[in-house]
Amino acid sequence: MQRAGSSGARGECDISGTGRLRLEQAARLGGRAVHTSPTGGLGARQVAGMSAKERPKGKVIKDSVTLLPCFYFVELPILASSVVSLYFLELTDVFKPVHSGFSCYDRSLSMPYIEPTQEAIPFLMLLSLAFAGPAITIMVGEGILYCCLSKRRNGAGLEPNINAGGCNFNSFLRRAVRFVGVHVVGLCSTALITDIIQLATGYQAPYFLTVCKPMYTSLEGSCKENSYIVEEICSGSDLTVINNGKKSFPSQHATLAAFAAVYVSMYFNSTLTDSSKLLKPLLVFTFIICGIICGLTRITQYKNHPVDVYCGFLIGGGIALYLGLYAVGNFLPSEDSMLQHRDALRSLTDLNQDPSRVLSAKNGSSGDGIAHTEGILNRNHRDASSLTNLKRANADVEIITPRSPMGKESMVTFSNTLPRANTPSVEDPVRRNASIHASMDSARSKQLLTQWKSKNESRKMSLQVMDSEPEGQSPPRSIEMRSSSEPSRVGVNGDHHVPGNQYLKIQPGTVPGCNNSMPAGPRVSIQSRPGSSQLVHIPEETQENISTSPKSSSARAKWLKAAEKTVACNRGNNQPRIMQVIAMSKQQGVLQSSPKNAEGSTVTCTGSIRYKTLTDHEPSGIVRVEAHPENNRPIIQIPSSTEGEGSGSWKWKAPEKSSLRQTYELNDLNRDSESCESLKDSFGSGDRKRKHIDSNEHHHHGITTIRVTPVEGSEIGSETLSVSSSRDSTLRRKGNIILIPERSNSPENTRNIFYKGTSPTRPYKD
């Protein structure tokens, strides 16, 4: 079959039935339903090529049943009735304005009358300009827009064609008719509204008395007696001019000019792009200024009062604004308006499923970041899962994972200030530290530390050393207490990011010689800043979930018993609580009793290295202690100073041969060191009850963590150090109390870490 086409196929509507719709349908069907044109035909290849050329333009055709009926039976009758009504109101005297009174010899109504032919903008010129000017501008703009959009690939941006009654209406025809039609109807409506208001008010124009020529002699009384005249006393010959003189409010010129200017300005703002920065403002200002001039000429030529013109501007602009927004949809394509409405009403689930709104992560940087994050989660599954157990809104806890595998069973007990970690550990050996930050009230922390410091100073803690061995002392070391304005952050690889801040240096005492010299001293890092939260490090010595097996229960009971036994060291020494914890955790010898105090309770701690207590500085923030007992078991004991060294400095005493080097760093927990084996004391049950009550209290304070890291070890001579002090001099720290008893290295060992903090308002007990 021969394919055919004609000029009728390219027209908007073809009476012979060879319209574009059928041609495009035939092209979509592969050229099967093709008709013959009466004017001749084209070859099959030519028609196939033409249809393929038109197909990429993608002109979607929609069938409409209500388009033509609405246009013929609704819109055209409204427009026709408006025009007819406007004709009778403007050009005939069928409808006359109401009669309103005036004052005798009113100078505001006695202005000269200017003939219509001498007006700057006559009424017919106004109608032609108000109708033709915007209409022509809109049609030209729509033609240019249609040509530009039709050249795009697949006709993007064009409205779909409408097939109604066998006629195909493209976007240019539809938009031009819609915009121009609304403009014409709007002008007619504005003129009708203005005429109705003028007829209803009957307000006189400034030239009314000039054309009326009132006969004051026909009045029953003089103008002095009747200053306000309501009778009809005009003697002018031209009734049309007299009636027009009674229709001043609002100004017809002002309303029509304002409507045309605002309507076409809205069209320019919505249609023109921003490629030309000055074209749109130029066109908008041109039409606005023209409308303003049309209204002001009515004032200068005494046709209307100023208030009439101003009210006319408001009425015309309001009508144009309403029609532009609601009748033509702000001159936007109908499909775009529908899409915008659907986007606004689309649910969040639809937006999440929309592939156009999903960010692609296929580039290198984002892919690396995602892979890195997934690797972190896989390597430290325990830390990620433990975050789900944080119930506090501002909880941001830093968890330091151990660097070496710990015992078979572990048990971590926290106070009510921090959540429990009840998740198993799936940790890669490469994984070092995971950081989570816990915010605290810095003001409250400073208050507690100040109270602790004042209490500590009031007791005038004195350090007494029972063993006097002056030989083999090593050079003094310094303890640096750092007060930071920003909390320290521990990265994934264990690196610390700490900004520079101020230092508080404390000169310690000397270290007696032992098998190894100890040139390096402890480093206490305390970070705080007024008005900022403190960083709390919570070490986790566990790699397994906290089990409720009988073995764990028995282990916990044993460590609770060991904790009660440590009252001897705590009551026998006038030392800070933190140093008592270190001494208890590092002890390995059996305590020997000797009558030292009035109560008969004695404490003897056996070890290879002797230490003096820490200074009075409040241990707020972060505390780290690192010791490295690779082969031997050093014991940390804090004796009291008897040689006038109660200044609160560190002194390290060890056996004569100086070969051991140990470093104590704050903020890491004891990794490989051995634990205290046994403690002997003679304290009564009353003290144990008090200790038990203290251990059951819940406190709201930060937690100080200690990590003892071995560096190098050698032979350490074991010596005995006896420490005693008054029972009333026991210091109850206002800060954080940490009890860390450690068991031996046996496979069945169990470590219990008890974190205790005193209540913020709890007083110190003697």
Curated annotation (Swiss-Prot):
TM region positions: 68-88, 120-140, 179-199, 248-268, 277-297, 309-329
Molecular function in Gene Ontology: lipid phosphatase activity; lysophosphatidic acid phosphatase activity; phosphatidate phosphatase activity
Subcellular localization, as worded in the UniProt entry: Postsynaptic density membrane
Modification after translation: O-glycosylated. Probably at Ser-347.
Membrane topology per record: Multi-pass membrane protein
Sorted UniProt keywords: Cell membrane, Glycoprotein, Membrane, Phosphoprotein, Postsynaptic cell membrane, Synapse, Transmembrane, Transmembrane helix
Disordered as annotated region, ranges: 454-503, 510-529, 634-654, 672-705, 741-766
Superkingdom of the source species: Eukaryota
Classification via Gene3D superfamilies: Phosphatidic acid phosphatase type 2/haloperoxidase
Annotated positions of the Phosphoserine modification: 37, 347, 386, 439, 462, 474, 608
Similarity annotation: Belongs to the PA-phosphatase related phosphoesterase family.
The protein, known as: Phospholipid phosphatase-related protein type 4
Record organism: Rattus norvegicus (Rat)
